[in-house]
């Protein structure tokens, strides 16, 4: 038996933000990030709409990128004092993810973060509040998913929290909020969405419902991401819908080891963060090569290649064409092909911010953590410790995974 869960209501299109006026309640807390929603006037609009709905409104501002356990606990404490019956999270994936976790600790102050790490272990929510999510970036799709990614900085590990309980009640997908994204953010979030759709399509939990969403999202992203990156606002609007479709797919089919590796490398090194969407873009071609040793996965990758009009006479040729196309997209979007060329903020660089020796020293533990990640279970192949270490090396040095040893593909950076 499968389950397919979505928000009860999804408002989309220009001026969808005004649907906040339809929410019914007494108090709403609005959770936001670093200030872009305020600078661009969207936060004031949201507050005005909520007040028009008759609600008292409180703000929780300043959620950092890759939100921490500490931020989650602070937000939950504010919620317990204010006692909202609506939690409205707006911005990129970080404030929405943080607000999802705050929601659990608001309703159940006695639980611990460790209680929530096990997938699908959340207590029943909506005892005190409902949840509305409003994305301003076109990538994470957390507005329609059962996921929240929170970082434990003491351990240097990102944890994907997973439970259908944290699927928002209302999603507002207004493309106006995404039109101010800078180019680099457009690239990284777009390839994050592409990874969501591809991993959902080859997941061991895929089904007819998720397949349709994933394939259409892949085609839209393939057609529109570069145009959006170059400033085409119609393509930017299309990408906002495409990432949401990808989110509906992966929230129900789940993900794979591209995300496992991105979660466990993102905050693991002293040189700085590996931005999540950029990590996915770098790792995806290597993981496709690894997963394609499974015949079923290879056939599904080949189906993706055909769907976006790539050429190949055999399944293997189609898989290789898909890998080449994704690497080409990375080049067009100025995304590094490997960690060895990962510069500050995800720019291409001759010298990586991730020290090679530190990476190699931490390789066994990083591989172990990636294998244990919640996303690994639905990957088409279950990697051994040795295989995961080889994959991570491939991601550092720009190699394609082969057996018994990776093959150098470092011709383009």
What residue spans do the PLM features occupy?
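ATP/NTP phosphate-donor binding region
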Residues: 1-86, 339
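Glycine/threonine-rich beta-strand-loop-alpha-helix active-site module
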Residues: 70-77, 81-176
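Glycine-rich phosphate/pyrophosphate-binding beta-alpha loops
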Residues: 139, 248-257, 263-275
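Carboxylate- and glycine-rich phosphate/diphosphate-binding segment that chelates Mg2+/Mn2+
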Residues: 147-253
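Gly/Pro-rich interdomain helix-loop hinge
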Residues: 268-271, 277-357
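Short, amphipathic C-terminal "tail helix"
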Residues: 359-400
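Single conserved hydrophobic/aromatic residue that forms the stacking wall/gate
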Residues: 401-413
